A protein has these predicted regions:
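Adenosyl-5′-phosphate
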Residues: 1-4, 174, 204-211, 221, ...
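Cysteine-centered catalytic environments shared across enzyme families
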Residues: 1-340, 352, 356, 513-514, ...
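Short hydrophobic/aromatic residue motifs in ordered secondary structure
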Residues: 34, 153, 276, 372, ...
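Conserved adenosine/adenylate-binding substructure
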Residues: 48, 59-64, 77-79, 127-134, ...
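Glycine-rich loop motifs involved in handling phospho/adenylate chemistry
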Residues: 266-275, 299-300, 347-350, 375, ...
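Short aromatic-enriched loop/helix-cap "lid" or pocket-rim segments at secondary-structure transitions
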Residues: 305-306, 333-334, 377-382, 535
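Short secondary-structure boundary/capping segments
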Residues: 336-338, 380-387, 601-602
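A mobile, often basic/glycine-rich helix-loop segment
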Residues: 376-401
Length: 606
């Protein structure tokens, strides 16, 4: 895992090496083990491409493996952030064909595949989590490529005749042509849903390369192309429950086997939930040196410590538990906001930030259970979608499902922002939903993969890479994705249990029942919430609100500050609007850092 930064001059203007160094500085936390920059020319004259790389050395820690990595003739430079898990199968094939490798990295395998197969055939071969930059001077192009699911981030923005790109948008702050401004068209969606679906961001003009997309930059412009789509027309498998569980078990074991490959210590991010517990079990079966790392809370209602201990004991791993409290919350607020690159929609991101900070000394690589809920139907709203549970509003099923994930209705949002208009955001999300061409449940799951999951993966990347910890997600391996898309509904969600708990993620829980008891597997799902009301009452937070956040909100003019005050009072009593209030805090924190340039001295300075 690493940090990428760079830019391309579309008009051939020479690249400024000092600007590249400054941009690369902004992502140095992602890769403290090595740093390398490279200037090259797409047109054979002035150096018009700038490539910067901060390396976190996980495989082949030698200097031979440094990036940017050049092809044998020096005409192609490649940057890879992430891991390609099937690279070693491809390596064996290439070696049989006579290719001689200089390193043991997946980066060199990807470079060889590009040279041998070309871009399109190479992309069809890659299974992993990655952001790729390929500068091909023979063809006069630069390719920006993101993995199929969107596990690793890659941002870009055009500033005049220069295209900037980076693993984190904060790198753009170091380029003199970039001006950080809020895009007003994205604010309503952020406040309602806590994140912005699709490729747009809250920074005007800044976009993400979409999951399964590539952006090709040439002298005459650039174009984005989708090279992979979530499987949609898959014929549903006719499997018994046991056969479905067996198949998932086989694929998860195989995926974890490829995910534990590392030349440094590796651990598991264990929440105590079913998904991370299964990953921990399978990881321990592959490596004896795997430990588990978890966050627990002083407040018993929010802590999963009982289930964490059960999972760790069952897997036979050492359990490291870190307490997250009011001091941890206040201590992480500014730093986590800075590293997130966007307003922190999920307040539990702060706990993940602390987990990565504390676990770094033990394990620079962590396996997580992220993705299983979105693939296999782990949320109650999926059960509602298949059962036809009526919405509280008279909307069609698509509209009802989309709005069910919003934290603020249009009525509530209008109180905060009288001119608010959720229409464009709803229509954009509807268009994403309607890309699906299957049954309603399958389309709901596809929509979650294209929206909510991508946002969760950004959180996973940014909070762990803030401390140079590589997060890996075995449930999102390609064969598991294909299986999930091919399973019929009865293996995903079912009717509520006698206790009134929706039966979700059926096949995953059936697999878990082979190792854990009924109480562990079928307890009501925990959302890993924080005791926010308690933190909001703290003296330190009250001072921050009164002295810094409310004045900032008032001068920014995005929201009605008197409404914010009322919501704050409700949030102090753990009112259901607590997390709705949180996003207002997150927005102002982020805006002060990225737009106003008000950052603590210990954060990256430009």
């Amino acid at each position: 895992m690493c940090g990428i930064a760079g830019f391309v001059s579309l008009d051939g203007a020479p690249a400024d090496a000092s600007v590249l160094e400054a941009m690369t500085d902004m992502v140095r936390h992602r890769g403290p083990d090595d740093r390398h920059t490279l200037l090259l020319s797409l047109r054979g004259s002035a150096a018009d491409v700038a490539l910067g790389f901060q390396r976190l050395a996980i495989l082949d820690r030698s200097t031979r493996a440094r990036q940017p990595m050049l092809s044998p003739d020096g005409s192609v430079a490649l940057l890879l952030n992430g891991e390609v898990y099937d690279a070693f199968d491809a390596r064996a094939e290439l070696e049989r064909d006579g290719y001689r490798f200089r390193t043991s990295t997946d980066t060199e395998v990807v470079l060889a595949l590009y040279e041998r197969l070309g871009l399109e055939r190479m992309l069809q071969r890659l299974d992993g989590m990655f952001a790729l930059v390929i500068a091909d001077t023979r063809r006069g192009v630069v390719h920006l490529i993101r993995d199929r699911i969107g596990i690793k981030p890659l941002y870009w923005v055009q500033c005049g005749r220069t295209v900037l790109f980076a693993s984190e948008a904060k790198a753009f702050l170091a380029h003199p042509a970039f001006r950080a401004e809020i895009d007003p068209e994205q604010v309503d969606e952020l406040l309602a849903f806590r994140y912005i679906a699709g490729e747009a961001t809250l920074l005007r003009g800044v976009r993400q390369v979409g999951p399964g997309h590539r952006l090709t930059i040439a002298a005459d412009g650039f174009a984005e192309t989708r090279y992979w789509s979530i499987p949609d027309d898959t014929e549903k498998l006719r499997l018994s429950r046991e056969d479905a569980v067996d198949r998932l078990d086989h694929l998860l074991c195989r995926s974890v086997r490829s995910h534990v490959r590392s030349d440094v210590n590796l651990g598991c991010q264990l929440s105590g939930g079913v998904d991370s517990s299964l990953v921990t079990l399978r990881a321990r079966a592959q490596r004896a040196d795997v430990d588990a790392f978890s966050i627990v809370f002083n407040e018993p209602r929010f802590s999963e410590e009982r289930w964490i201990r059960t999972a760790a004991a069952t897997a036979g791993v050492a359990s490291h538990q870190f307490v997250f409290d009011e001091a941890g919350f206040m201590g992480a607020l500014d730093a986590a906001s800075w590293h997130m690159d966007q307003p922190i929609g999920h307040p539990n991101s702060l706990a993940l930030w602390l987990l990565a900070e504390r676990s770094r000394a033990h394990a620079p690589v962590l396996l997580a259970g992220e993705g299983a809920d979105e693939l296999f139907g782990g949320y109650g709203r999926f059960a509602a979608a298949i059962s036809g549970t009526p919405s509280s509003a008279p909307h069609d099923p698509v509209d009802a499902f989309i709005r069910a994930t919003a934290f603020h209705s249009e009525t509530r949002l209008a109180k905060l922002r009288p001119a608010a208009d959720l229409g464009p955001a709803i229509e954009k999300r509807r268009a994403i939903f309607q890309e699906g061409r299957s049954d309603h449940l399958s389309n709901c799951l596809r929509y979650e993969m294209r929206t909510h999951l991508v946002d969760l993966l950004l959180r996973q990347d940014k909070m762990t890479m803030a401390h140079a910890v590589e997060s890996r997600v075995p449930f999102l391996e390609q064969h598991i994705v294909d299986l999930a898309r091919a399973l019929p509904a009865e293996h995903l969600v079912g009717a509520a249990s006698p206790a009134g708990v929706p039966v979700t993620k059926v096949v995953v829980k059936a697999l878990a029942r082979r190792s854990f008891d009924e109480a562990f597997v079928h307890r009501r799902k925990s959302a890993f919430n924080l005791p926010l009301a308690q933190y909001f009452r703290s003296k330190a937070f009250v001072t921050m609100m009164e002295d810094r956040l409310l004045p900032g909100m008032r001068s920014r003019g995005l929201v009605d500050v008197e409404v914010v005050r009322r919501w704050w009072r409700r949030a102090l009593s753990a009112h259901p609007t607590t997390e709705g209030f949180w996003v207002l805090v997150a927005l102002e924190l982020w805006a002060q850092q990225f737009v106003d340039g008000r950052r603590a001295a210990h954060l990256n300075s430009v």
